[in-house]
C-alpha cells in the first residue's frame, strides 16, 4: 500500500510539473505573438485537461498573466487589419508630394479608424433604420406631406415619374395592381384631408366649449392616424419622404419670420392703432398657416426639433459606417490606377459609391456590408473612368466592348505568342475584321499637342505636325513672283481689256464677276464684254506673252487652283 501511495504521489507530481511546463509554453507563445487562440490552448494542454473547470482555471491563469485569448476568426481579422495597414502605409509612402500631401494625410488618418464586426454593422444599421422610421413618422404628421404625396401619385398615374424612383419596389410586388389602387388611395387621402381641415378650423372658434374642444381634438388625432396610414400605403422611398421634409423646413422658416413679426407688433400695438391692426392681420395669417400645416406653432416647433435630432442621429450612424469602410474603397480603387484618373479622384468616386451602399444596405438579408458595398464602389469607380478618363467621352457599352477586345487579344497573344490579326481576333470574339479595326481605332487615346518628344523635352508633338492652313515659304514666293509677272503682262493690253480680264477672273479680290456685272461698269451689253474678253485672251496666248507665264503652270497645278482656290493678283 505504501508503494502504491508513493507511485501515485510521484505520478501527480509529474503531472503537475507537465501542466506547469505547458502553461509556461502557453505564456511564451502568447508573448511572442501578442495573443493566443483557443485552438492553440487545446493543442498544447495535455489530454487529461478535458473538463470545463480545468479549462476555466487555465483561462483565469492566462488572464492574470495579461494574456489575450482570441477566437480563430478574431485572429484572421487581426491579420487582415495588419495586412491592410501595411498596404496603406505602402500607398502613403508611394504617394508623391510633401508630408502634407492630401493623399498621404488621407491614408494616414484613415488607417486609425477600426474596422467593424458583423455585429457592429447590424447595430449601426438598426440605428439608421430606427432614425428613418422616426423621421418618416414626424414628416407624415404635416398636411404638406398629403399634398406632396397626392401630387406625386398623379404623376405616377400619368406616367410623368419613374415608378422605381418614387416607390420602394421591395414593398410592392405587383406594380400594375399598385397603380390601379392609387386613384382610390388619392380619393381617401383627399377626404381625410378635408375632414382634418374642417376640424382644424372649428378648433379656432374662441366660443368653443371645453368638452367640444376635447371631442374635436380626439377626432383630429384619429384623422391624423388614418392619414398617416394611407400615406404609408404609398410605400415611398426614404429619399422621397425626406424631400417632403424639405417642404416642412421651408415652411418652418416662414413660420419663424411670422412669429418674429407678431412679437415685434405686440410691443407697438398698445400705443399704435395701426400696429394693432397689423397684429390682428398677422395673427389671422398665422392661423391660416397653422391650418395649412395641420400643426399649431408650438407643435410645429416641437416636431421640427425632433426631426432635426433624428436626422442628425441618422447622419452620425451613416458617417460611422462610411468611415469604417474607407479601407475597402482604397483596396478597390488601387486596382484601377493608370486608367486616366488620379488615385485621389478614384478614391472620391469610390467614396460616393460607398455612401450609396450605406443608403441601400439591408442588414436583414444576412450578408456583410463589405460584400454588398464592393459592387457599388466598383460600379462608381468604373463609371467615373468611363465618363471622365478620356478627353472624348466614349459610351459605357463601348468601353465594355473595348475591354472585351483587349482581353481577347491578350488571351490569343498568350496562346500563340504573337499579336493577333483583326481576322483572328474577330473569329475568336464573333466580330467582323472591320468591326475589330473600328474598335481599335475608337480605343486610341488622344495625344496632347504639348506632349514632349525626345529625352530632352525641347520639342513638343505639335512641332512635327504640318499646318495646312498656312502657306509654305516656297508657295508664297511663287505666288509673289506670279503676281509681279502677271502685272507686267497685263500692262501690254489696253486699259479696257486689262479691266475685263481682272474682273472676270477675280484677279483683284479673288471673286470672279459675270458678264453683266462687268458690262454695267462700261454701260455695254454682256455680248460686247464677251468679245473684249475673247480678244484679250487671244493676246495673252501669244507666244511673246504666254512664255513669260508658262513657268508658273507647275505651281498652279500643284496648288490646284482650278479646284476653287483663287489667288488675287494684288496684295
From Swiss-Prot:
UniProt subcellular location: Cytoplasm
- In chain numbering, motif Interaction with polymerase core subunit RpoC lies across 345-348
Identify the DNA-binding region of this protein by residue numbers: 515-534
Write down the InterPro entries for this protein, in alphabetical order. Answer: RNA_pol_sigma-70_dom (IPR014284), RNA_pol_sigma70 (IPR000943), RNA_pol_sigma70_r1_2 (IPR009042), RNA_pol_sigma70_r2 (IPR007627), RNA_pol_sigma70_r3 (IPR007624), RNA_pol_sigma70_r4 (IPR007630), RNA_pol_sigma_70_r1_1 (IPR007127), RNA_pol_sigma_70_r1_1_sf (IPR042189)
What cellular-component terms does GO give this entry? cytoplasm
Q: Where is this region: Sigma-70 factor domain-3?
A: 400-476
- Alphabetically ordered keywords of this record: Cytoplasm, DNA-binding, Sigma factor, Transcription, Transcription regulation
Signal peptide location in the record?
none
Q: Which residues cross the membrane?
A: none
Note the Gene3D superfamilies from the entry. RNA Polymerase Primary Sigma Factor (1.10.601.10), Sigma-70 factor, region 1.1 (1.10.220.120), Winged helix-like DNA-binding domain superfamily/Winged helix DNA-binding domain (1.10.10.10)
Q: Which Pfam families match?
A: Sigma70_r1_1, Sigma70_r1_2, Sigma70_r2, Sigma70_r3, Sigma70_r4
Q: Which residues lie within the region annotated Sigma-70 factor domain-2? A: 321-391
Q: Which GO terms label this protein's molecular function in UniProt? A: DNA binding; sigma factor activity
Q: Where is this region: Sigma-70 factor domain-4?
A: 489-542
Q: Which GO terms describe its biological process?
A: DNA-templated transcription initiation
Give the protein's biological function: Sigma factors are initiation factors that promote the attachment of RNA polymerase to specific initiation sites and are then released. This sigma factor is the primary sigma factor during exponential growth.
Family stated for the protein in its record? Belongs to the sigma-70 factor family. RpoD/SigA subfamily.
Description of how the protein assembles with itself and partners: Interacts transiently with the RNA polymerase catalytic core.
Q: Under which name does UniProt file this protein? A: RNA polymerase sigma factor SigA
Q: Which organism is it from?
A: Chlamydia trachomatis serovar D (strain ATCC VR-885 / DSM 19411 / UW-3/Cx)
Q: Which gene encodes it?
A: sigA
